[in-house]
């Protein structure tokens, strides 16, 4: 069986975690618009994730879609549909990570803090270790912050079984959304494949998340 591009990138990650990064920085010259590996990656915006480095991707090989948490929301789906149908990607890689900031709050808590609730401001400040400055007013946008479901924990708390399962549950939730979207085919000649991972920020290693399994939601 021919190795998938995702499997090849996992081998790059093994080398990266061992101190042998395969990403080559620098402008490579003219490139085609379609990603040469036919891969799209959805990942968290966390500064500790250098997606190109940890997957050994070169310029022009993949689409990189990033947001807070690496969550599969409407905009991520919009990007994936365009990536697949117009730019010929067929493998989707979803990357969450340990010590994620999306574990440190709930949607209701952050919204209350932004609107000026003193108790919420204090709790967020305790979680983040910095003074939280409220906007002091309400806003309908964004409609949700999409924090991972569960009790808030201190920002950048050490990895635990509970936090790992919360992250894995959101990976599975994202996989389910992608696999069940009517415009992202999983069968036939134009089928996509989707796999989800947790990146350990302490070791540099990607760990695959089993699917199906327990799924999370937004806090």
Swiss-Prot record:
SMART domains in UniProt: Pro_CA
Q: Which UniProt keywords apply?
A: Hydrolase, Metal-binding, Zinc
Q: Where does Zn(2+) bind?
A: 44, 97, 100
Single GO molecular-function term? hydrolase activity
Instruction: Name the needed cofactors.
Output: Zn(2+)
Q: Which SUPFAM superfamilies has this protein been placed in?
A: beta-carbonic anhydrase, cab
Which reaction equation describes what this protein catalyses? carbonyl sulfide + H2O = hydrogen sulfide + CO2 + H(+)
Superkingdom as given in the UniProt entry: Bacteria
An example Pfam family from this entry, by short name, is Pro_CA
* Enzyme type, top EC level: hydrolase
List, alphabetically, the InterPro entries matched.
Answer: Carbonic_anhydrase (IPR001765), Carbonic_anhydrase_sf (IPR036874)
Q: What does this protein do?
A: Catalyzes the degradation of carbonyl sulfide (COS) to hydrogen sulfide and CO(2). May function as one of the microbial sinks for ambient COS, which is an atmospheric trace gas leading to sulfate aerosol formation, thereby participating in the global radiation balance and ozone chemistry. Shows little CO(2) hydration activity and poor carbon disulfide (CS(2)) hydrolysis activity.
Record-stated family: Belongs to the beta-class carbonic anhydrase family.
Q: What is said about its interaction partners and assembly?
A: Homotetramer. Two pairs of subunits form tightly associated dimers.
This chain belongs to the protein called Carbonyl sulfide hydrolase
Organism of derivation: Thiobacillus thioparus
What is the gene called? Answer: cos
């Amino acid at each position: 069986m021919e190795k998938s591009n995702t499997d090849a990138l996992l081998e790059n990650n093994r080398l990266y975690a061992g101190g042998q990064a395969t990403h080559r920085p620098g402008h490579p010259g003219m490139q085609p618009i379609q990603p040469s590996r036919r891969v799209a990656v959805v990942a968290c915006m966390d500064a500790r994730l250098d997606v190109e480095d940890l997957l050994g991707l070169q310029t022009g090989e993949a689409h990189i879609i990033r947001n807070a948490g690496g969550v599969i929301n409407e905009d991520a789906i919009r990007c994936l549909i365009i990536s697949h149908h117009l730019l010929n990607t067929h493998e989707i890689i979803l990357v969450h990570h340990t010590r994620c900031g999306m574990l440190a709050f709930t949607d209701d808590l952050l919204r209350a803090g932004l609107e000026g609730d003193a108790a919420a401001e204090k709790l967020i400040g305790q979680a983040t270790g910095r003074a939280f400055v409220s906007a002091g007013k309400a806003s309908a946008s964004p409609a949700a912050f999409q924090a991972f479901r569960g009790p808030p924990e201190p920002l950048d708390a050490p990895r635990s079984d509970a936090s790992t399962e919360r992250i894995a549950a959101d990976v599975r939730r994202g996989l389910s959304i992608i696999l069940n979207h009517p415009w992202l085919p999983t069968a036939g000649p134009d089928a996509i494949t989707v796999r989800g991972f947790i990146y350990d920020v302490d070791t540099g290693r990607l760990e695959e998340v089993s699917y199906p399994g327990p799924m999370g939601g937004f806090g």
